[in-house]
């Protein structure tokens, strides 16, 4: 059996690696000959995927921000088409990554109409889409959906799609891989009297430009107002390190840089995280660390979103979306200033009542994400679906 898995960006590589590992384990237990090939990043390759192209750094949010990736994405898609013409697959598994994945799925739907397509982790068009067009595009190419959020499952079930809610795979990652606060601080050589602030600015290149300066400015202010502040910054992709180091130098900040694989350690050790909006917000919440969440896109992208698409979401972070209330502060676009970030951070660090409420909200969030064993359930559903489709075509 050959399964093609397609995703992109840092978060897709992480989610994909967890699925690849679970698929390989189940195939071994079932004595099933399984070949996994596709698009992703180093984590997926390390887990056992034959990588056709590395797409971990190819991703953006916004119209103008995506322009630089048009040619690389097109080239990768042509490579995928050539591969699939000579290497038939039994199942296509898509993970998030809406634009590129829909292009591949539409090609396969037209060229091989009987090929089954499973979406694992649907793009969050169900949250942010201003029209029904994006939902219709996903529905048109999806035979089965494995949802990680309850709201995601409910939304697509109402649209008539075959959906199974498996829970969020980060539950498994945190359970198996995350260190305790004490062991994380010991590993990093942090004294008990130090206040640790972990900075998580970017999984996309555009975020270094739009978010890192404000984050550094906020860190500067917090260091000037609090004693014994230690700053940590895990670098999600090695290619980002030169730009990060240059920005830190401009702000005269002393920050302990860590490899991306140390992200959970950097979070677990923290008293506060200052972070971009994204999947990492759930990791922070599952490790019970207060966080200030921010996001920015180019002014042109935001102007188009507001005026043409009437962009007006109550929340953008998954921590707030899951519970449908603002359990953590979000600072978006013009609000994402250094002073606003620092002020929100001080409130989270110094207000004991707020910290107690955060702990309660985080527990509710954890319960809403399902039970551990997510990756095993997802892998089982993928293999059962693939086997069922093979038998129906036989």
From Swiss-Prot:
Catalytic activity: a lipid X + a UDP-2-N,3-O-bis[(3R)-3-hydroxyacyl]-alpha-D-glucosamine = a lipid A disaccharide + UDP + H(+)
Protein name: Lipid-A-disaccharide synthase
Short name of one Pfam family: LpxB
GO cellular component: membrane
Keywords noted in UniProt: Glycosyltransferase, Lipid A biosynthesis, Lipid biosynthesis, Lipid metabolism, Transferase
Protein's pathway: Bacterial outer membrane biogenesis; LPS lipid A biosynthesis
Its job: Condensation of UDP-2,3-diacylglucosamine and 2,3-diacylglucosamine-1-phosphate to form lipid A disaccharide, a precursor of lipid A, a phosphorylated glycolipid that anchors the lipopolysaccharide to the outer membrane of the cell.
